[in-house]
Amino acid sequence: MTSKGAAMSFSRKSYRLTSDAEKSRVTGIVQEKLLSDYLYRIFSSPDHGTPAATSRKPLNFHNLPEHVDQLLQVDDEESQGQVEGRLGPSTVVLDHTGGFEGLLLVDDDLLGVIGHSNFGTIRSSTCVYKGKWVYEVLISSQGLMQIGWCTINCRFNQEEGVGDTHNSYAYDGNRVRKWNVTTTNYGKAWAAGDIVSCLIDLDDGTLSFCLNGVSLGTAFENLSRGLGMAYFPAISLSFKESVAFNFGSRPLRYPVAGFRPLQDPPFADLVRAQRLLGCFQTVLSVELDPVEGRLVEKESSEWQLHGQPTVLLTLAHIFHHFAPLLRKVYLVEAVLMSFLLGIVEKGTPEQAQSVVHQILDLLWLFMEDYEVQDCLKQLMMSLLRLYRFSPIVPDLGLQIHYLRLTMAVLRHEKSRKFLLSNVLFDMLRSVVFFYIKSPLRVEEAGLKELIPTTWWPHRSSREGRDGQEAKEETTEERQRRRAYERGCQRLKKRIEVVEELQVQILKLLLDNKDDNGGEASRYIFLTKFRKFLQENASGRGNTPVLCPPEYMVCFLHRLVSALRFYWDEYKASNPRASFSDEAYIPPQIFYNGKVDYFDLQRLGGLLSHLRKTLKDDLASKANIVIDPLELQAATMDDLDEDEEPAPTAAQSWRARQRPVQALAIGGALPLPRPGWLSSPTLGRANRFLSTAAVSLMTPRRLLSTMEKVKVRSLNVEQRTREDIEGSHWNEGLLLGRPPEEPERPLTENSLLEVLDGTVMMYSLSVHQQLGKMVGVSDDVNEYAMALRDTEDKLRRCPKRRKDILAELTKSQKVFSEKLDHLSRRLAWVHATVYSQEKMLDIYWLLRVCLQTIEHGDRTGSLFAFMPEFYLSVAINSYSALKNYFGPVHSMEELPGYEETLTRLAAILAKHFADPRIVGTDIRDSLMQALASYVCYPHSLRAVERIPEEQRIAMVRNLLAPYEQRPWAQTNWILVRLWRGCGFGYRYTRLPHLLKTKPEDANLPSLQKPCPSTLLQQHMADLLRQGSDVAPSFLNSVLNQLNWAFSEFIGMIQEIQQAAERLERNFVDSRQLKVCATCFDLSVSLLRVLEMTITLVPEIFLDWSRPTSEMLLRRLAQLLNQVLNRVTAERNLFDRVVTLRLPGLESVDHYPILVAVTGILVRLLAHGPSSETEQATSVLLADPCFQLRSIRYLLGQPEPLAPGSALPAPDRKRFSLQSYADYISAEELAQVERMLAHLTAASAQAAAASLPTNEEDLCPICYAHPISAVFQPCGHKSCKACINQHLMNNKDCFFCKATIVSVEDWDKAASTSATSSAA
């Protein structure tokens, strides 16, 4: 059934006013008596019914208008002006003209408000002083707000709002309190989607509130009344909180008997509309039978419009009066909405859709376009309000009815296209229809009956016990778990009904076959969807215009379901296309300008920069030529954007914005209205699309200059099906295909753009929301641990201590009730957010991103055009699957899981150091993702499975010098590859931290050691092969170790001085954190040195290499410095460790000493004797070497100096022997052999050492004799100092002259040469 009727064209004009001749001719179609009976049956008076046939005059279309006018006469006793007890305009709105302090954003209709300051206050334009009154507040966010009443004399500010002054009264559902100068507990907690009714009884002087129609009881009594006392509805909101008021402009959702809305309903129009609706319903249920000459009663669901002139003329007379009424908000919601909902509730979905479809046909047929458009707009806004602010009931019946009606309306093609073009994304947020809100009060939602038995997982609270405490499940626990799971399944099935309806609605919006009268729905949706994404991508700092993330999560899942349906449907009819499992975004979409990415960052930087630097590659690889003149104009346009003249900027602003809203700050100032309450902010168009002329060469062959045809990319708002899907000469979105891309089509181009937008949605806010919802599960685990600890205490508590038993029993009850509540909420969260189906959606997006990145990488330099969010979504979606969905569902069961892990590993390994990626944030994200990846055994094995050349390239990038780049994460990756192989390096947590409260065991740093011998071997091979790889890498590691440990020592000196002051003082927590970080960096750098010297000892010990001796001397110097600082008893390090300051938990003797010991053992207790002797001589030659530091490792006290006091006998000494669980007996034996070797070698060195003249010592280190002279300046030092200096700087240490060469210098030879010359 189309809006044209049964192949006949009817218009409202044809049937509203007709000539007498026409009426006579039409009347003759049926008998006069039958027509009169029919019209009396349709237009019967509600008061007197249908008059008897003998007492009435015949009714026909000639005298019908008079009859209808008489039928619609209403005695309007209700005054539309002033009513006793009320002062102010009859149309009640928020007073945005001033009289209060605070900053607020007020919607166009002056009924919605968003807090935009610390605590802004606003009141209504009308007050009451007598009688019983009520208004409703629709809660859009559940934060800090105080809602109630105030008088005109109340003065508010940014700290004090409604309820904080005399004669102002408020209810605060966020803190569950009532306010009137003082505060007490009152009511229940509210949530987003609730409706608060505010009632004031000025006859009795009482004030009360209702939440979703349920009374919360009397809040205040003995209100001040009398002369000058009138009360205004008022609200105070904190920043970002939002509500909408209903003073009576729409039917109250929860009317209260005896209480009157502040704004009177349109009584006369309401009666007329109800009578006209009754006439319309009668038309649907009564049929003319001309053959039998009688009226036939039938079900309205069976009614069909057959083009009967009598029926059409009758409907024309009805709509002549009905159409103007259907433009009014109140009447649409009270009359039309109720009628349509009744149809949906009574019939089957198919019957309801058929009837609604025909009703919409009639609306378009008999009403003017502007009338039906206003009607549909109000209808959808009412539907959205009803859906959004409906309470959750056990069977979700309310939500199902509203969604079924929404779907029935959208099935009507003409209505759907109008709503898509003008309403769904412009006037209201259609994403609300795809949201299923989470109930805050599980009892009211019926979850207690749906899930009568609760259960929660029992997890061990101590890490390191490896599940030793994990008891087997008892029979009772197993029965509880199964009963809980059955309840969860019942809940999930009910939620799936709602989700399926939401998917069906989206399928209607994505229909691309309804192009009979204009553009198909999908292409309208694409334009609006892109603007929606632009608003949320560009409005990060403007919270009011952003779509709430919880809505985005639901919208994304429904969009993925609808998208995959259409994708696979296209594959079924086009065998050459791809299945949705193989979906990806072709790389040309990122650089051909056909899709708007707003101002989002690209991997290679700014789009304007990429277009200039890569224009040759675009021409050679993608056949896209950018006009230099247009490019220059676009660049200058971007530069001058902020310097445009004021009038032009103002005109542009007005052209881009919807109607303004009021800025409530003592006066009415224009401000862009917040998108969530009204229309979106469009923002500026992409400069690439609007100004850059792009030349496109469509054939895949080399073209001459003459064949290059210049065309301009179409703006997003102007695109048609041909612009997107293409034609025989135009590839549409896929214009500029690179040679690496296959020619076969993936799917319809429009679906590619929907997929691209879906990936962008995930990056905008979905991932953060998925992480936020994990908090419910965390709360369950915390309360479960608290309950178990309480039950353990109850079992241990002596029965004679009844006071303790009573307190423990009370705590047990509190924890049990809280767990019952949380476990039911968790069931809801798992069903709506973390279900298996939702996990598959996120996994599919991960695979889409991986394939998109792989295809983009093949384009070479054009990969830089890819938006950054593709890489971030690949990283974040994997993190979500592992950390958010993993505890509920097993990742190993995902299809192709191992292959996906390997592909992601290859991407991280290749691109973390990719020069085509310039953004600091995305490079850091890639580095952190790779660092996390190598911490878990299954993902580390995936790294080992990538091709060998990629593994070697990754390790080569890890071994690049640390200077001029972020190196901490790189070093941490190398440490993780070594952890489990180093000396005493098999711990998960440090030994001294095991007894403290555990952290999250899922953290990467708390995973069990899983070293990679394969990657270690690659590292060893690279360090051996490259002549300059090892020196530059180790020089940078030694430099960073010197810096990190020096910073650490400097900071603990400041901390120690602050701790020793007598006056009260505080140490900055940030300083403690930086101090601990420097210590951790020092330990990790030492571990990298240990790994290097273990894998490739010849780098330090093969002195045939030019840098080996220098590196060994530097290493020995640093090791001795660390040992001296850490091992001296009662020194700075010892005292700070003893303080055990919060934030310095990781600072301890063990981690840094075992790292140093591992290096020393490898140098002195392994390898041939020649290498050992070389290492020993270098170590002993360092002036900072002290044998007591080595003895300290085994707990041996240093010899007492003459006259020194004996150490305290109860002092606990550090010793590696005390860590038998962490250090093996073989390792301890190696330390003992090392100590014996050094003891003997130091004794020999002491006997052989000769005194040295101070003038002959190196002026840089004052430790070694001068042995080198710099040319041409002639300054001198020891070889070790100048070699180390030249690793980083070529200027002279003393005079800054450039050093050309370094020559050996011998004092005796120099002296003799001088004497000879003399």
Swiss-Prot record:
- Entry annotated with the keyword Protein transport: no
Give the UniProt keywords, A-Z. Answer: Cytoplasm, Metal-binding, Methylation, Phosphoprotein, Transferase, Ubl conjugation, Ubl conjugation pathway, Zinc, Zinc-finger
* SUPFAM superfamilies per record: Concanavalin A-like lectins/glucanases, RING/U-box
| Region: Interaction with NFKB1, residue numbers | 972-978
Per the record, residues carrying Phosphoserine are S679
- Sites binding Zn(2+) 1 sit at C1258, C1261, C1278, C1281
Q: Which GO terms describe its biological process?
A: protein maturation; protein polyubiquitination; proteolysis involved in protein catabolic process; ubiquitin-dependent protein catabolic process
In residue numbers, the region (Disordered) covers 459-481
Which residues are annotated as modified residue Asymmetric dimethylarginine in the UniProt record?
R687
Looking at the record, the residues that make up the B30.2/SPRY domain are 72-252
* Zinc finger (RING-type) boundaries: 1258-1296
- Listed GO MF terms: ubiquitin protein ligase activity; ubiquitin-protein transferase activity; zinc ion binding
Q: What modifications does the entry list under PTM / processing?
A: Ubiquitinated, leading to its degradation. Deubiquitinated by USP19, thereby stimulating CDKN1B ubiquitin-dependent degradation.
> Which Pfam families did the record assign?
SPRY, zf-C3HC4_3
The EC number(s) attached to this protein equal 2.3.2.27
Which chain positions lie within coiled-coil regions? none
Q: Where is the composition biased (Basic and acidic residues)?
A: 460-481
Q: Mind naming one GO cellular-component term on file for this protein? A: cytoplasm
Q: Which reaction does it catalyse?
A: S-ubiquitinyl-[E2 ubiquitin-conjugating enzyme]-L-cysteine + [acceptor protein]-L-lysine = [E2 ubiquitin-conjugating enzyme]-L-cysteine + N(6)-ubiquitinyl-[acceptor protein]-L-lysine
Q: Where does Zn(2+) 2 bind?
A: C1273, H1275, C1292, C1295
Q: In which pathway does it act?
A: Protein modification; protein ubiquitination
PANTHER family assigned to the protein according to its UniProt record, in alphabetical order: E3 UBIQUITIN-PROTEIN LIGASE RNF123 (PTHR13363:SF5), RING FINGER AND SRY DOMAIN-CONTAINING (PTHR13363)
Q: How does it assemble?
A: Component of the KPC complex composed of RNF123/KPC1 and UBAC1/KPC2. Interacts with UBAC1 and CDKN1B via its N-terminal domain. Interacts with RIGI (via N-terminus) and IFIH1 (via N-terminus).
Q: What does this protein do?
A: Catalytic subunit of the KPC complex that acts as E3 ubiquitin-protein ligase. Promotes the ubiquitination and proteasome-mediated degradation of CDKN1B which is the cyclin-dependent kinase inhibitor at the G0-G1 transition of the cell cycle. Also acts as a key regulator of the NF-kappa-B signaling by promoting maturation of the NFKB1 component of NF-kappa-B: acts by catalyzing ubiquitination of the NFKB1 p105 precursor, leading to limited proteasomal degradation of NFKB1 p105 and generation of the active NFKB1 p50 subunit.
The identity of this protein, by name, is E3 ubiquitin-protein ligase RNF123
- The record lists the organism as Rattus norvegicus (Rat)
